[in-house]
Amino acid sequence: MRQYLLDTNVLIDYLTLREPFGATAAALLRAGAVGKVRFYAASLSFVTIEYIIRRQTSTAQARQLLEQLAHVVEIVPVGAVTVRQALASDFTDFEDAIQYFTALTQPTIQAIITRDPKGFRASSLPVLSVAGALLELDNAA
């Protein structure tokens, strides 16, 4: 079974069905529901997602969506070591660095799925687009 860390942008696309990315993000998350893949998300992503969705809808709606998401992904805590690693890294985007070093805390994570692969140029893990992850899962079947 493949194991991926989902970047915050993919999770927002999925939860909000943001065009034109929402449909492919939903297709990817459905693969997890049928046991083809296991998904992880950084705990920090939940904070960011709540802030963004709350501004578009309501606090209650944001919390409801996050509760649903918590059943679909394994939440990986972001700790002090991860923050220090991100601060000392060559990543130009701090949030991407947090995602990357969070992924490294879980040795079973095989890739990071993002809509912004340029943000992960310093990554030693493979970085896939949502479409690339779907293709990889189809080829593994």
Regions found by a protein language model. Give the residues of each.
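Helix-adjacent hinge/juxtasegments
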Residues: 51-77
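Short acidic-hydrophobic, aromatic-tinged amphipathic segments that line or gate anion-handling sites
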Residues: 75-78, 127-131
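Short, well-structured N-terminal submotif of metal-dependent ribonuclease cores
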Residues: 1-41, 54-64, 122, 132-141
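Short loop/helix-cap segments at secondary-structure boundaries that form the rim of catalytic
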Residues: 118-125
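Active-site neighborhoods of divalent-metal-dependent phosphate/nucleic-acid chemistry enzymes
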Residues: 74-117
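A general alpha-helix detector
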Residues: 10-11, 47-49, 82-85
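Hydrophobic helix-cap positions at the C-terminus of alpha-helices
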Residues: 31-32, 69, 106
